[in-house]
Every structure is written in C-alpha cells, then in structure tokens.
Design a protein with these regions (language model features):
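Active-site loop/oxyanion-hole signature of alpha/beta-hydrolase fold enzymes
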Residues: 5-6, 31, 35, 44-82, ...
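Active-site glycine-rich loops that stabilize anionic/oxyanionic intermediates
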Residues: 22-25, 84
Length: 263
C-alpha cells in the first residue's frame, strides 16, 4: 500500500515499472506480464482508485488518480504503463509529474474524448440489476449476467470484482461512482492539462489491431502531448491487448524498457 492505493510487487532488482489497469479491472489483470518482466525489473501492480482493494472516492477524477499514482513513484523515476482508463491516468501523471516518469507506455487509448454508447453502459446496468441480497453463488451471478453480457470472458472479467463477505455478496469496485461518471472516464480533462508542457520522455503507444480505440486521426493529439511517441500495433489483438497477446506485449515492453526502438 502507498497513499491508500493497493499495490503488489514482482521482482526485486532492476528499474521500476508501474502498471495501471483499465476500467473495472485490477492490478492483478497484469500479473502474467508482471511475472515475465520481473526477471529484469521491479514491477508494481496498482489497484487504481475505486477499483480492487484501493479506496473509494466520491467522484472519479483523472487528475486526482494521476496524483495518487505519482505519489507511488516518489523520488525514483519509473516507467509507467497504462491500459485504457489506466492509460489516461498514466498520461496525465506523466504530464503533471514529468520528473517522476522516466518513460511511458500507453496501451490502446488516446488522449481524446470518446463517444457515448460504449459497451460499458450495458455492463454497469447488468451489474446494478444483479440482486446481491438473494445471490447464492458466483455461478448463479454468471448465469444471471449472461443474457445482457453474452461473452463468457467478459463476464469472468467483471465477476472478479464480486466478493463474498460472510453471507453477503458485494461489488469490490465502486460501481455507483464508476457508473455515474462514465462520461468523465470516456473524456479527457483538456482544461485541466492545457497549461502543462508536453511530456519530454520516450513514449510507446500500443494499439490492438482489432480495436477501434486508437484511430489515425488521434495521432496529432498524441504527438502534441507526447512528441517522442512511437506507435506499435499488435496483430490479432482487440482492446485487451495484454490479455489477448501477452507474449507480444511482454516482448514489446522489454525492448522499450531497455531503451530500444519498439517500432
């Protein structure tokens, strides 16, 4: 734990790498990648605010989350890696605290406002409709979610947030705040970062080939904030690049962390 955020560490030597998960995720989503990188690095898995074992907030705020992550880094600059929502947190942390971030990897997200109508509204509605008071088992929860969320892998991802405490089931994540603040999470705090300088360090921008989160017309905005950016597309991967192509992500990250061109 540091500044209230829950963390797990893999590896005991080498430079530091901090991994930030996406919406509805937890640090442990990156465990496979962390274990592979831990042969040469100290890897920190973070549960972001309102997720996993980290504290809840009253409203989701990208700048506040970025400040909390920067506090983890302290006086030793680290490589910061973030996926989706965690990628936006990582980008803002690098812009607001450039002295704390040695290099940055942004996975399948851009510093832009995304349109309404994403699948996450459906996820939130289905999770809110689940009657936790009468729920008996996790398998029952899976069955009840299946009409609204047909993909078993997505249900399994969401249900990792379901915890049993005694006889009572509860969501470990802050479902109400995350659901109410989806517009904020889809957004980009342009006004809040407008006065900040571009990040001077190297940046790796990883896109999933089958994902539409990174578009060609996002490049100019990305280059405005991160002039040393290099883009890599992972073939066959959708939005959850690190889960779908972990070996490729590990190799790309190893090269980037070693200072080599990952292009």
């Amino acid at each position: 734990m540091s500044d209230g955020l829950y963390t797990r560490t893999w590896g005991d030597h080498g430079s530091r790498v901090v991994l930030c998960h996406g919406l509805f995720g937890q640090g442990r989503n990156w465990t496979q990648v962390a274990k592979a990188l831990a042969t040469d690095h100290r890897v920190l898995l973070v549960d972001l605010p309102d997720h996993g074992r980290s504290p809840w907030t009253d409203r989701f705020d990208y700048l506040a989350a970025a400040d909390r992550v920067a506090d983890l880094l302290g006086d030793e600059p680290a490589a910061l890696v973030g996926h989706s929502m965690g990628g936006k947190v990582a980008m803002i942390a690098a812009l607001a605290h450039p002295q704390a971030v040695e290099r940055l990897c942004v996975v399948d997200v851009a510093p832009v406002v995304y349109p309404d109508g994403s699948e996450f509204e459906g996820f939130v509605a289905a999770m809110r409709d689940l009657d936790l008071a009468s729920l008996q088992t996790r398998d029952e929860a899976d069955t009840l979610l299946s009409p609204a969320i047909p993909a078993p892998t997505v249900r399994a991802f969401l249900l990792q947030n379901l915890r049993r405490e005694g006889e009572v089931w509860r969501w470990q994540l802050n479902l109400d705040v995350l659901g109410d603040d989806l517009d904020t999470i889809r957004g980009w705090p342009e006004d809040a970062v407008a006065a900040l300088d571009p990040f001077p360090g190297p940046v790796l921008w990883v896109a999933g080939e089958r994902s539409d989160y990174i578009q060609d017309d996002h490049a100019a905005t990305m280059e405005r904030w991160f002039p040393r950016v290099r883009r890599v597309t992972v073939r066959g991967a959708g939005h959850w690049v690190h889960a779908e192509r972990p070996a490729v992500v590990v190799e790309v990250l190893r090269r980037f962390l070693a200072g080599a061109s990952a292009g």
